[in-house]
UniProtKB/Swiss-Prot annotation:
Motif QXSXEXXXL positions after renumbering to this chain: 14-22
Localization (cell): Secreted; Cell surface; Fimbrium
Native organism: Methanococcus maripaludis (strain DSM 14266 / JCM 13030 / NBRC 101832 / S2 / LL)
Residues of the propeptide: 1-13
PTM statement from Swiss-Prot or TrEMBL: The N-terminus is cleaved by the prepilin peptidase EppA, which recognizes the class III signal sequence. N-glycosylated. Glycosylation is AglB-dependent. The N-glycosylation does not occur unless the signal peptide has been cleaved first.
Biological role stated in the UniProt entry: Minor component of the type IV-like pili. Essential for pili formation.
Induction / repression: Expressed under standard laboratory conditions at 35 degrees Celsius.
Pfam families (UniProt xref): Class_IIIsignal (PF04021)
Domain statement: Contains an amino terminal motif QXSXEXXXL, which is part of a class III signal sequence.
GO CC list: cell surface; extracellular region; membrane
Keyword Hydrolase: no
Protein name stated in the entry: Minor structural pilin EpdD
Disruption phenotype: Deletion of the gene leads to completely nonpiliated cells.
Keyword annotations of the record: Fimbrium, Glycoprotein, Secreted
């Protein structure tokens, strides 16, 4: 147990610990950004589908009045 603690508090171990915390922060930020991109793309997809449906319904109404 004390050997593991000595590795944590040595200069080389401290640099490794700082690097692992930095990598963890970068990975966490990438996960959050990816989640945000997926959620926002789903919202855009839904709004685009609604727009397409409204345009289609308007076109069908206009064409049904002509014939």
């Amino acid at each position: 147990m004390s050997v593991a603690l000595k590795k944590f508090f040595s200069k080389r171990g401290q640099l490794s610990l700082e690097f692992s915390v930095l990598v963890l922060a970068v990975i966490t930020a990438a996960i959050l950004l990816g989640y945000h991109l997926i959620v926002s793309s789903k919202a855009v997809q839904e709004s685009n589908i609604d727009t397409i449906n409204n345009t289609h319904n308007t076109a069908i109404d206009a064409l049904s009045e002509v014939s």
